[in-house]
Amino acid sequence: MSVSGPLPRIPAEAGAALFTDARTAYSFADTPVDDATLTGIWELARWAPTAANTQPMRVLYVRTAEGKERLLPHLDEGNRPKSASAPVVAVLAVDHRFHEHLPHVLPVRPEMKEYFEGEPAQREAITSFNGPLQAGYFILAVRALGLAAGPMAGFDPAGIDKEFFADSDWHSILVVNIGHPAGPPAFDRMPRLAHEHALDWA
């Protein structure tokens, strides 16, 4: 596809699947999610923009009984049944050693690897902004592949990091339950702000 000139719009039904018709899932069917689909989520999400193409987000897929046993105690009590019912739980993290990949992902500026090595505050700034940005892309990629996402912030990051990432520089930022919904939403969709309350013009 050419990136010059007018770009095509996605069909209305695709926009609905990603945004207006999509709902957060709180319980899930037993239908498994295969490796190809989970890999496909990343294959979509990785193309969205990040600052200097740094791509600091990483994903841990938890789906075995053993993995769930390790994860659930670190979730807020009210969130545990949601993750227990999901066939897959994605722990989204940021890699504070993201700069080691810069010669590959930013070949026009390979020297930035050495710059970030000596600037831990700048690495923190990159991960704190771009990690959550990529998390948003990840949720949309889940929906694009016909699955429901249930993002949750109610967990103990330090506990998850100690349990799963003790030997790495990954640090958890979000937990996302993934699968097919077990049934209709438990409550009506909540309102969103109308443009009159959210937009300004200059």
From Swiss-Prot:
EC number assigned by the record: 1.-.-.-
Keywords: Flavoprotein, FMN, NAD, NADP, Oxidoreductase
UniProt GO MF annotations: oxidoreductase activity
InterPro entries linked to this entry: Nitroreductase (IPR029479), Nitroreductase-like (IPR000415), Nitroreductase_HadB/RutE (IPR050461), RutE-like (IPR023936)
One Pfam family linked to the record: Nitroreductase
Coiled-coil regions listed in the entry: none
Root EC class: oxidoreductase
Cofactor(s) for this UniProt protein: FMN
Family of the protein in this entry: Belongs to the nitroreductase family. HadB/RutE subfamily.
Name of the protein described by the UniProt record: Putative NADH dehydrogenase/NAD(P)H nitroreductase SCO7141
Species, as recorded: Streptomyces coelicolor (strain ATCC BAA-471 / A3(2) / M145)
